């Protein structure tokens, strides 16, 4: 709610036009009630669809068939299914799942791993490699295991995509990597569950998957009205639309707590510690850092070679003696063995 209220303020007070562009448009207008009687979402008035005949366009762009299987599978079972196909992308919910499936794929042809356990420079290089391999007919087998990082803003096209169960918006984003350029009459996106290994943890991911499971069985997932219904299902189960209690800090004109609100607000909840890894010329930059100290241009360059880990995993790496604090609050992975050229940062003790 506070984010939408900020956009409404820009619109009403400053005359700003806000353009929402996504293949999985959330419901941002009207009044929606949550499970708590006091939890109401007050949306933006007068949102106008700028694409004419939206429903006809969605029909025209149907290039993918969805195959849904909600029965719990193991890593081995999913890896075996993925290995049936030569050009295939499999997207999972966590970095751990990506590593487990990657390790189980057969070592034939090209197999690649994409997750935030790779530093940004490594991710960019791998995405460029994927694009080149998909165009190169001399490499008939290209299998990629990835996390959600490929679901938005990454222009890759596979004839077959696998997507672990999640919210409808994520599934349709994954389907957008399938038969993207219409080379085939129809592509196939398989939706699968890893519940035989573990249940989806409680939280936003669980809520999103439950909202999808509560859609009518005969729903057409590509129909824009189904996406609207999905978001209603998601919102109506919420206890609050203001998780960080921004209303308490910013909505009382007699007591505006901007500093506290700034500290508490996070667009994306993230308790990660950043570690500089040994990739490319990162260690040369670290030596410059030791010699010259912290400068903005240098830190901007080093940001391309960092991996974020949760505090518990950070403590684990410290206990292995794998991390050095080169300057206050700046950490470097000194053990080269802890960063794999295929799967990135390893949290195991080598």
Task: Go through the PLM ranges and name each one.
Residues 1-10:
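SF2 helicase catalytic motif II
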Residues 3, 74-75, 126, 146:
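Amphipathic coiled-coil/heptad-repeat helices and related helical stalk/stem segments
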Residues 9, 13, 17, 23-83:
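Interdomain hinge/linker at the junction between the two RecA-like core domains of SF2 helicases
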Residues 11, 76-85, 91, 96, ...:
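C-terminal helicase lobe and adjacent C-terminal extensions/tails of nucleic-acid helicase motors
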Residues 13-19, 87, 140-143:
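Loop/turn-to-beta-strand initiation segments
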Residues 21-26, 92-95, 146-149, 165:
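A short beta-strand-to-loop transition that corresponds to the Sensor-1 phosphate-sensing loop
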Residues 119-147:
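Conserved helicase ATPase core of P-loop NTP-dependent helicases/translocases
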Residues 142-158, 173-181:
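SF2 helicase motor core recognition
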């Amino acid at each position: 709610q506070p984010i939408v209220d900020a956009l409404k303020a820009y619109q009403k007070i400053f005359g700003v036009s806000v353009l929402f562009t996504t293949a999985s448009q959330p419901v941002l207008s009207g009044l929606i009630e949550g499970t708590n009687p006091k939890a109401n979402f007050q949306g933006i008035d007068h949102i106008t669809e700028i694409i004419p005949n939206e429903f006809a366009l969605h029909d025209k762009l149907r290039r993918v068939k969805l195959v849904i299987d909600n029965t719990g599978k193991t890593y081995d079972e999913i890896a075996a299914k993925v290995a049936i196909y030569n050009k295939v992308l499999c997207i999972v919910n966590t970095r751990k799942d990506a590593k487990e499936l990657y390790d189980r794929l057969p070592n034939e042809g090209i197999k690649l791993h994409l997750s935030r356990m790779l530093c940004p420079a490594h991710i960019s290089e791998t995405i460029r490699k994927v694009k080149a391999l998909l165009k190169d007919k001399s490499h008939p087998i290209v299998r990629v295991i990835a996390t959600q990082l490929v679901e938005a803003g990454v222009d890759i096209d596979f004839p077959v995509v696998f997507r672990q169960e999640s919210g409808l918006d994520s599934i349709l984003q994954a389907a957008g990597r399938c038969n993207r350029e219409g080379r085939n009459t129809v592509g196939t996106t398989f939706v699968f569950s890893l519940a035989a290994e573990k249940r989806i943890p409680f939280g936003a991911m669980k809520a999103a998957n439950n909202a999808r499971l509560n859609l009518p069985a005969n729903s057409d997932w590509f129909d824009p009205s189904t996406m609207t219904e999905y978001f209603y299902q998601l919102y109506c189960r919420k206890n609050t639309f203001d998780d960080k209690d921004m209303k308490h800090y910013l909505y009382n004109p007699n007591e505006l707590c901007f500093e506290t609100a700034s500290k508490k607000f996070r667009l994306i909840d993230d308790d990660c510690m950043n570690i500089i890894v040994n990739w490319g010329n990162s260690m040369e930059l670290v030596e410059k850092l030791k010699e010259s100290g912290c400068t903005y241009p240098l830190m901007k360059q080093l940001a391309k070679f960092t991996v974020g880990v949760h505090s518990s995993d950070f403590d684990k790496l410290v206990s292995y003696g794998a991390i050095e604090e080169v300057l206050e609050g700046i950490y470097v992975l000194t053990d080269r063995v802890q960063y794999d050229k295929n799967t990135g940062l390893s949290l195991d003790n080598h």
